Amino acid sequence: MRMHLHLTLVALGAAYVCANAVESTMNRLVAETLTLLSSHRTLLIGDGNLMIPTPQHTNHQLCIEEVFQGIDTLKNQTAQGDAVKKIFQNLSLIKEYIDLQKRKCGGERWRVKQFLDYLQVFLGVINTEWTMES
């Protein structure tokens, strides 16, 4: 029993370290992509005539699909040189990460009490982290 508990704790620790490593890698990837976007903005703008549907909503979490559709449009209309190739590679990796995270949304059935606990946390996030529009 003691050995089982020890192995469980080791496994949980390993999972925590792995999750932190992925988050840290993603943070670096996003930071690098922001730097690249800033550096190559003029190249991406081109002649300035490309029109890309852009969400008006300030809660970016709600507009992920639209943002990535815009990225695809930009990618298809931008000359593919080494400078922008890395940007679109990074954006593709970020999308893959988000898609993996979205798969966690389809959870198991919980009792009402557990669902209400989750709902309270969810509403707390909306209340504190989302910009409310009127």
Swiss-Prot record:
Homodimer; disulfide-linked. Interacts with IL5RA. Interacts with CSF2RB. GO terms for molecular function: cytokine activity; growth factor activity; interleukin-5 receptor binding. This is Interleukin-5. Homodimeric cytokine expressed predominantly by T-lymphocytes and NK cells that plays an important role in the survival, differentiation, and chemotaxis of eosinophils. Also acts on activated and resting B-cells to induce immunoglobulin production, growth, and differentiation. Mechanistically, exerts its biological effects through a receptor composed of IL5RA subunit and the cytokine receptor common subunit beta/CSF2RB. GO terms for biological process: immune response; interleukin-5-mediated signaling pathway; positive regulation of DNA-templated transcription; positive regulation of immunoglobulin production; positive regulation of podosome assembly. Keywords: Cytokine, Disulfide bond, Glycoprotein, Growth factor, Secreted, Signal. It comes from Bos taurus. PANTHER family: INTERLEUKIN-5. It is found in: Secreted. Residues 1-21 form the signal peptide. InterPro entries: 4_helix_cytokine-like_core, IL-5. Gene3D superfamilies: 1.20.1250.10. Belongs to the IL-5 family. Glycans are attached at N76, N90.
